[in-house]
C-alpha cells in the first residue's frame, strides 16, 4: 500500500482534498510553534502504528516510566523528526534510546505479542467515545477529544480531583465548640 502524506490523509478523511489537509497541517504546526515546538507534519507520512503501540505495551511491562519515555521518543520521531514510526528500524532505535532489551524488542516485532492488549485498548477507546486522536481520559471518567487549550485540561483535572477528594461539609453551627480563644458553651 503506498503511503500518503499527513495532509493527503487529512484531506481524504475530512474532505477538501490535499489542499484542505495542508491547511490543517499548517494550523497544527502553527499551534505547536506557539508552544515552542517544531512540528514537521508537512514532511511526515501517514502510517500505521500497530507495532509502535505493541512496543508501548512491552515498555509498560518494564515500568510506567519506560512506557512514558518510549511514548515521548515515538512522538518526537513522528512529529519533530518526521520519521516513519511504522519502520522497524525507527522502532528499534526508539526502543534502544529508552533502554528496552533489544532481544525482547525483536521478539515483539517478529510476532503478534501484545496485539490482544492493543485491541483491548482500541475497544476501551471506543467505549469512551473516542473517534480520533488525540483523546485523553482523566480518572476513567472524563474524556478530552482533540487538541484543547490548557484551560480545558486544568478544568477537567480540577474537577476530577474535587470529585475524588470532596471537601468536608460542616453540619450544624460552631457556636458550641471550643476554639483557640476558649469555649463558648
Predicted stretch roles:
Residues 1-79, 183:
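Structural alpha/beta surface segment adjacent to cysteine/selenocysteine redox centers
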Residues 57, 61-185:
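C-terminal cap of thioredoxin/glutaredoxin-like
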